[in-house]
């Protein structure tokens, strides 16, 4: 009888973190087992039917650049695509897509089932096998033991999950799925630092009962239609659908206020803290009491269903209040609710107990990714899952870990924030969290990370060939623009005014002309000489290459300045702190700082500097102590390094 029970990596959970973790590990050649309580829910979008957004779209592009599945699955399932902040600078532009839930799950499952080195098995996990301080496997509900050299735990909201609808509550991982109570209890036995968080979801509405004629239509972008993945294309997209906009009103707000005495949030039944940037409708009405109306987006759940997701009214109010508040809004007077909204509480574990690899500090080989680390959102989960899967594989291969820095990726910002600052509420990514966001754009995610992904072994041949072609095309076009000159002798003043806004008084390289505020790559390519010959073009046709060339030239000064800033910080950012470092012995440190550093054990000086309460003066004292102590990397530092810190 042949049934494999020994693997290199076990991934527990088949959500966005688990699927990316399993795919990454398997792409890198490790035998990988993905355990899920239900194979039918692999890649399920548990809340809103959308991928991307401000900060989140950047993470999706980074996962894609490393060979991940989320972006290409969205291209195959996306029923509306938009570029947010399109009128603003490239650093904050972000792709957002509405996705057909069924098509998205199909796209993810297809990749899982066709990925070499990856096995799927349907069983919930009740226990982890731990020998000494190392995890060695997992035990399912049926008592089946699987052994592995690394385990990635991506439990989502399932750990001791509890759903609240009004004053009623029951145990669940999400609506329709059982919780992971035994696994939660087992993790508590392992003395991992733990807390409770909560999130919520709105009621779903039957589209046949919605009067769209009185709502505002919100179509997707059409010129051009955005594409998420470097491997994607518009031809992959299914039929496109609009969203619709309505608003709450004073009657809605009165109904909500009248139901607060039966709200689990406002009666103390819910202990967990909810997401600040995705508040429930009752929280909005309470916190923004002076606001007369809130915008609500009706988002289609898919092409083959009438179900709509009313984005903006997440709630745990009793069902009768939910029905009344929905029907109080314009266009929803006769709305039929298909599923009630609810809040869910769940266990999470303090991410300050993790290394930058997402491996736990106390149990070797055990990695955490997704909501278990206190984050919220599909995109944040997928990025963490990929990182955990990569590092689990690297550990087994006895290779150096990969931990992106804050100046390299939004994923680096995400993980650094989690492991140095922890969370008091579900963490959501925004572009404002990244101090080097001009260098961490959506458009250059592949230029930043695909080379790294190839070296790690998680970027395939087809994607690599596409990337090399693009990189070479960008380099060639930049060189052409820098070496092609235009002078007043061959450029008529009228033509210069048409393209450049004014005439030129001397010879200019095309690259310098493109840097002018009102000149675009497209208009520059149309520049003609006095004899009618092309002076600017024909240029390149590939939109991604044109975009990269234009941004690199127009923002060169700012990007170079940011690169110099990164270089200044590099002298201490990546200095590894000794594992045995005794913070209590550092003279001049406050007791609070000593205790925090001793508890969190930061891996680098840069991480230490971002722990709450650790001041620049404290970092300087640590540097002095380390240099005097003769610690290898610090003894060779130049004089006055501590002053620069």
UniProtKB/Swiss-Prot annotation:
- Co-factor requirement: FAD
Location, primary (coarse class): cytoplasm
Q: Where does NAD(+) bind?
A: 274-288
A GO molecular function for this record?
A: flavin adenine dinucleotide binding
Provide a GO CC annotation, any one. cytosol
Cystine residue pairs: none
Q: What is this protein called?
A: tRNA uridine 5-carboxymethylaminomethyl modification enzyme MnmG
- What does the annotation say about its assembly with partners? Homodimer. Heterotetramer of two MnmE and two MnmG subunits.
Localization per Swiss-Prot or TrEMBL: Cytoplasm
Amino-acid positions noted as binding FAD in the UniProt annotation, renumbered to this chain: 13-18
NCBIfam families from the UniProt entry: mnmG_gidA
UniProt lists the family membership as follows: Belongs to the MnmG family.
What is the stated purpose of this protein? NAD-binding protein involved in the addition of a carboxymethylaminomethyl (cmnm) group at the wobble position (U34) of certain tRNAs, forming tRNA-cmnm(5)s(2)U34.
**GO annotation terms (biological process):** tRNA methylation; tRNA wobble uridine modification
Keyword terms: Cytoplasm, FAD, Flavoprotein, NAD, tRNA processing
The answer on whether this UniProt entry bears the keyword tRNA-binding reads no
* Entries under InterPro entries matching the protein: FAD/NAD-bd_sf (IPR036188), GIDA_C_N (IPR049312), MnmG (IPR004416), MnmG-rel (IPR002218), MnmG-rel_CS (IPR020595), MnmG_C (IPR026904), MnmG_C_subdom (IPR047001), MnmG_C_subdom_sf (IPR044920)
């Amino acid at each position: 009888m042949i049934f494999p029970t020994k693997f290199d990596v076990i991934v527990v959970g088949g959500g966005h973190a688990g699927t990316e973790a399993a795919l990454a590990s398997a792409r890198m050649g490790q035998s990988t087992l993905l355990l899920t309580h239900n194979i039918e829910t692999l890649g399920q979008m548990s809340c809103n039917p959308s991928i991307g957004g401000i900060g989140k779209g950047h993470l999706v592009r980074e996962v894609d650049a490393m060979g991940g599945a989320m972006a290409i699955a969205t291209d195959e399932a996306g029923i509306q695509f938009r570029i947010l902040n399109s009128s603003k600078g490239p650093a904050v532009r972000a792709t957002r897509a509405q996705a057909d839930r069924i098509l998205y799950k199909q796209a993810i499952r297809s990749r899982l089932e066709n990925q070499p080195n990856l096995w799927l098995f349907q069983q919930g996990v009740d226990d982890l096998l731990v020998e000494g301080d190392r995890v060695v496997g997992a035990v399912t509900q049926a008592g089946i033991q699987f052994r592995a050299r690394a385990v990635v735990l991506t439990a989502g909201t399932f750990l001791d999950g509890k759903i609240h609808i009004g004053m009623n509550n029951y145990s669940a991982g999400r609506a329709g799925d059982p919780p992971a109570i035994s696994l939660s209890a087992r993790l508590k036995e392992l003395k991992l630092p733990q807390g409770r968080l909560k999130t919520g979801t709105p009621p779903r509405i039957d589209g046949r009962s919605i009067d769209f004629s009185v709502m505002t239509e919100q179509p997707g972008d059409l010129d051009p239609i955005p594409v998420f993945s470097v491997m994607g294309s518009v031809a992959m997209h299914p039929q496109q659908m609009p969203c619709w906009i309505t608003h709450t009103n004073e009657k809605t707000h009165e109904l909500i206020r009248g139901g607060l005495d039966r709200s689990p949030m406002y009666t103390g039944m819910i202990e967990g803290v909810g997401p600040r940037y995705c508040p429930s409708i009752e929280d909005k009405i309470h916190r923004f009491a002076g606001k007369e109306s809130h915008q609500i987006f009706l988002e289609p759940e898919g092409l083959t269903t009438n179900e709509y997701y009313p984005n903006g009214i997440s709630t745990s109010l009793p069902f009768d209040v939910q029905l009344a508040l929905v029907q109080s809004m314009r266009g929803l007077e006769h709305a039929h609710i298909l599923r009630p909204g609810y809040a869910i509480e769940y266990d999470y574990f303090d991410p300050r107990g993790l290394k930058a690899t997402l491996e736990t500090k106390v149990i070797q080989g055990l990695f955490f990714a997704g909501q278990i680390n206190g984050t919220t959102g599909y995109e944040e989960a997928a990025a963490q899952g990929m990182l955990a899967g990569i590092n689990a594989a690297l550990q087994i291969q006895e290779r150096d870990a990969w931990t992106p820095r804050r100046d390299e990726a939004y994923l680096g910002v995400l993980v650094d924030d989690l492991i140095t600052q922890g969370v008091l509420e579900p963490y959501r990514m925004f572009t404002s969290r990244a101090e080097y966001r001009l260098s961490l754009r959506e458009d250059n995610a592949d230029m930043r990370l695909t080379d790294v992904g190839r070296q790690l072994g998680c970027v395939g041949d087809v994607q690599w060939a596409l990337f090399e072609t693009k990189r070479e095309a960008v380099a060639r076009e930049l060189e052409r623009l820098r070496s092609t000159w235009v002078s007043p002798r061959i450029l008529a003043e009228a033509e210069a005014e048409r393209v450049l806004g004014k005439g030129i008084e001397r010879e200019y390289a095309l690259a310098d002309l493109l840097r002018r505020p009102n000149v675009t790559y497209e208009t520059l390519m149309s520049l003609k000489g006095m004899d009618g010959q092309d002076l600017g073009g024909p240029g390149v046709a590939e939109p991604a290459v044109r975009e990269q060339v234009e941004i690199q030239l127009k923002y060169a000064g700012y990007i170079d300045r940011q690169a110099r800033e990164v270089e200044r910080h590099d002298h201490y950012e990546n200095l590894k702190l000794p594992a045995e470092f005794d913070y209590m012995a550092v003279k001049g440190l406050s007791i609070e700082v000593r205790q925090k550093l001793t508890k969190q054990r930061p891996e680098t000086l840069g991480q230490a500097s971002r722990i709450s309460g650790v001041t620049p003066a404290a970092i300087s004292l640590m540097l002095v102590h380390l240099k005097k102590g003769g610690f290898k990397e610090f003894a060779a530092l130049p004089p006055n390094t501590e002053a620069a810190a």
